[in-house]
């Protein structure tokens, strides 16, 4: 024998199995605490459903409304919230310790764009050959980046050597 399927969403009408409820009518006005059967009758008279809005309250709060419309509004709110939610991405900018001024400006423009879009930026400074003997040049460049972007970004991960590269992560303010 199979158990009856569990219903999703709030309980409504005869599914509300508490003796008393706090009723709010279809106009949003509080009607007070009353027996559940009386609240269901009031909902039927209005041609609407009695929906349990706050089940954990004492007594539970129920509202008279059109359940189909209510469900649609809830779905709409969920979709709006999902649209507004932005996943923060980690964008990477690769630099060299002896980068030319114009090349640096081009990279800086793309970093500005990433910060405007709300993304974090990982700055990877690659050392090759003898450049590895002068990590202070890399540190100087990353300090320049930090100063140039202090109004729009904050340092999330301080400059640090990892193998042949130096890494720093900036996050938008």
UniProtKB/Swiss-Prot annotation:
GO terms for biological process: ribosome disassembly. Its main location: cytoplasm. The keyword Cytoplasm applies. One of its GO terms (molecular function) is translation initiation factor activity. It is found in: Cytoplasm. InterPro entries: T_IF-3_C_sf, T_IF-3_N_sf, Translation_initiation_fac3_CS, Translation_initiation_fac_3, Translation_initiation_fac_3_C, Translation_initiation_fac_3_N. Keywords: Cytoplasm, Initiation factor, Protein biosynthesis. Disulfide bonds: none annotated. Gene3D superfamilies: Translation initiation factor 3 (IF-3), C-terminal domain, Translation initiation factor 3 (IF-3), N-terminal domain. GO terms for cellular component: cytosol; membrane. IF-3 binds to the 30S ribosomal subunit and shifts the equilibrium between 70S ribosomes and their 50S and 30S subunits in favor of the free subunits, thus enhancing the availability of 30S subunits on which protein synthesis initiation begins. Monomer. Belongs to the IF-3 family. NCBIfam families: infC (TIGR00168). This is Translation initiation factor IF-3. It comes from Phenylobacterium zucineum (strain HLK1). The gene is infC.
